[in-house]
A protein has these predicted regions:
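Extended, low-polarity transmembrane helix blocks
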Residues: 1-97, 103-123, 133-206
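Transmembrane-helix motifs of polytopic, lipid-linked glycan transferases
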Residues: 126-130
Length: 206
């Protein structure tokens, strides 16, 4: 049960096994990459770039946290394989906005759960890494938007869900596709550093 955002964040950062260690490595790597960009490129030293970095960092952390209740080998949060991803996939049968999605989940996805579950888990982990490290963020944003659309439509009719939550996530991920937040204190900025360097006068005159 959640208590408050501060104690819950502290618990998230200090409890758990290997997943907490990996998250800390991603977090420290993100900070280190941001510092390197900030030091190398004066154009990165702006409030806008810092905000873009924090935005993708937090959304990346969201996807990482969401992957924790669908860990292999069961891809659920119970040793017997119940709950977790299997439960929420089942909820889409009842909550999907359109019958075609509900039928697909019922007839294709659930009967082949262990084919689709690793793809969902891997997708969320890769998405979290992409956004936290600022690497291939357009691809990460596009993948995140698709996953959010699936959640928005798949759980739309459930009274326990607020559809706007997923819709806002779609909007944010599309903004990542459009504005390439990895160019703000991320690995995308380091990789594209030479390309983005200003053209010299000699180069312009030539």
């Amino acid at each position: 049960m959640r208590k408050n955002p501060f104690s819950d964040t502290l618990s998230f950062l200090t409890t758990g096994g290997w997943t907490t260690v990996v998250f800390w490595l991603l977090l420290l790597a993100s900070v280190g990459i941001a510092f390197l960009n900030f030091r190398r490129d004066p154009r990165q030293r702006s409030a806008l770039h810092v905000w873009n970095w924090l935005s993708r960092l937090f959304i990346g952390a969201l996807w990482w946290q969401q992957s924790l209740w669908k860990l292999p080998p069961t891809y659920t949060d119970q040793p017997d394989g119940s709950g977790g991803l299997r439960y929420w996939i089942g909820q889409m049968i009842q909550g999907a906005a359109f019958h075609v999605q509900a039928d697909f989940v019922k007839k294709i996805v659930l009967p082949h759960f262990y084919f689709f579950a690793p793809q969902v888990y891997a997708g969320e982990v890769l998405l979290a890494m992409s956004l936290m490290l600022g690497l291939f963020t357009r691809v990460g944003g596009f993948l995140g938007a698709l996953m959010a659309v699936n959640l928005w439509l798949g759980l739309y009719r459930l009274n326990s869900e607020w559809p706007w939550t997923y819709f806002f996530l779609i909007v944010i991920q599309i903004m990542f596709v459009a504005y390439r937040p990895g160019r703000s204190l991320g690995l995308d900025a380091l990789v594209g550093h030479e390309e983005s360097m200003p053209v010299s006068r000699a180069g312009r005159s030539g």
